[in-house]
Regions:
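Small-residue hotspots at the loop-to-helix junctions and early N-terminal turns
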Residues: 47-58, 135, 139, 198, ...
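Short runs within selected transmembrane alpha-helices of multi-pass transporters and secretion channels
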Residues: 71, 141-160, 168-176, 197-212, ...
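Short alpha-helical transmembrane segments in multi-pass integral membrane proteins
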Residues: 1-24, 78-145, 189-246, 302-368, ...
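Transmembrane helical elements of multi-pass membrane transporters/channels
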Residues: 19-38, 141, 175, 204-208, ...
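Helix-terminus/linker motif at the lipid-water interface of multi-pass membrane proteins
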Residues: 29, 33-51, 120-129, 185-192, ...
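Hydrophobic transmembrane alpha-helices of multi-pass small-molecule transporters
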Residues: 62-65, 179-183, 209-213, 286-289, ...
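Small-residue-rich hydrophobic transmembrane alpha-helices
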Residues: 50-110, 149-168, 274-340, 371-396
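N-terminal transmembrane alpha-helices
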Residues: 8-40, 44-45, 61-73, 77, ...
Length: 451
């Protein structure tokens, strides 16, 4: 389902787009619903457990997002080579991606395991002792899983790059089913609490990584590692990957560090606010499923278009995918808006936490419809064209000026509480949207030489 042989016609038929998108939609739905189920299961242990998992997951996401930026770089390079019909270099770039991910994730995991308590103290400062105890347990086991989630993300990105999103969907299914089954057994069956939740996540990620690496070696896969020697680090393909991966990693890293700063601010509002924020973040991802789906589809579609030299088609498909994201976001957010009073009852929150959670999610529903797709789906088109430095610059500046600084002003000066934290995020979205729309309209993002 890669680009067609004749570049004069459409590179992706409606059927090809549908075949790419529906597994991504199912994969995102699985990921979000299973993530919510994970939160629900941990919630049974108490608010301290929910708070600890929420805090550590914000740190986990920081680390995983930085490392997964390498997967984005590899996917962009591979998709452009596939668009050019150069399967040999596409395969070599895939092998180099696996090497870089393997080395970097092991190194980061070891550091986090050795310094787990120190890192938590530096990032989150003084928190309740029960929360810290649970957090250290969860973080230590999470660090063991970094190499496996890294290899899974790399393999999934490469399968999407060639238009085969079914494999990444199946890997996600394997990972999430094992995670939920493991939670049921370890949390409820053996009473292991937070440790059980972390072990279930680890086991799921191990199976997902093994599955996707096994599928990678299928003889019909154009991005399979053909020779063991291809895994030996080589300068040119690594530099190509890093040309996208480093700016994207810095962007993701600074974005998540900013979120951690905001999480530290949220932690000063009390356990109820931490729990409300954790559940609001979890529930809001339901409404983001259509947007995340189209964001994942954007990189392989636009990457192959630009690899084939079809700039007009790149612009056209970007508009189609962004429009689809907005339409889906409108429907999902409208549904969540009306269902939220019922949904919040699933999470065993106190009355105060439930009220805070419902309030911020309702505001999220409104802003997401108008600004999420242009903040997060559109920049993936720019990245697919090699414009990662621009998206990095905008994201970092907007994040720190608006989401971080404004959040502190809203909370500390105007005493808006958790609502102030979320309004800082909404204003960040508005700034990003304006910058990315202007950049896209000018067309400079298509002028980069990536391969």
């Amino acid at each position: 389902m890669t680009a067609t042989a004749k570049s004069k016609g459409p590179l992706f038929t409606k059927r090809a787009l549908f075949t790419l998108i529906w597994p991504l939609l199912l994969e995102q739905t699985l990921s979000v619903t299973m993530g919510m189920a994970d939160t629900l299961m941990v919630a049974g242990v108490g608010e301290a457990a929910v708070s600890s998992v929420s805090l550590v997951d914000s740190l986990n996401i920081l680390i995983i997002q930085i490392l997964s930026a390498l997967a984005t770089g590899g996917a962009v390079i591979a998709s452009q080579y596939l668009g050019r019909r150069d399967e040999e270099n596409a395969s070599r770039s895939a092998a180099q991606l696996y090497s870089v991910l393997g080395i970097s994730t092991v190194a980061v995991g070891v550091v986090c395991m050795l310094l787990s308590r120190l890192i938590l103290r530096i990032v989150f400062g003084s928190i309740d002792e029960d929360v810290m105890r649970f957090a250290q347990q969860y973080f230590l086991i999470s660090a063991v899983s970094y190499p496996f989630i890294g290899l899974y993300n790399g393999g999934a990105a490469l399968f999407r790059a060639q238009g085969n999103s079914r494999i990444s969907m199946l890997a996600s299914l394997v990972m999430n089913v094992i995670n939920i089954a493991g939670n049921a057994l370890l949390i409820y069956g053996f009473g292991m609490g937070v440790i059980g939740a972390a072990l279930a996540t680890l086991i799921g990620r191990v199976f997902a990584a093994v599955f996707i690496l096994w599928q990678n070696q299928d003889l019909h896969n154009p991005l399979r590692v053909q020779r063991f020697a291809d895994l030996r680090p080589r300068r040119r393909p690594i530099m190509q990957i890093l040309s996208i991966g480093i700016p994207s990693g810095l962007e993701n890293g600074m974005f998540q560090i900013g979120k951690l700063c905001v999480s530290s601010l949220t932690s000063t509002l009390g356990t109820s606010a931490i729990a409300a924020n954790a559940v609001a973040n979890s529930v809001s991802t339901l409404a983001n499923i259509p947007g995340n789906t189209m964001s994942l589809a954007t990189i392989p579609v636009i990457g192959q278009c630009l690899g084939a030299g079809e700039k007009k088609q790149a612009q056209r498909y970007s508009g189609i995918l962004r429009g689809s994201a907005i339409t889906g976001l409108a429907g999902a957010n409208a549904a969540l808006f009306f269902l939220m009073p019922e949904v919040v009852t699933w999470f065993n929150l106190s009355a105060a936490a439930s009220a805070m959670c419902t309030h911020v999610v309702h505001w999220f529903n409104l802003f997401s419809i108008f600004f999420w797709a242009t903040s997060f789906t559109l920049p993936n088109a720019l990245r697919a064209g090699g414009d990662a430095k621009f998206t990095m610059s905008v994201s970092i500046v907007s994040m720190w000026l608006f989401r971080v600084i404004l959040s502190y002003i809203f909370v500390l000066q105007f005493h808006l509480g958790l609502t102030g934290v979320w309004f800082g995020m909404f204003i960040d979205w508005i700034c990003r949207s304006l910058c990315f729309l202007v950049r896209f309209a000018r067309g400079k993002w298509m002028e980069h030489k990536v391969i």
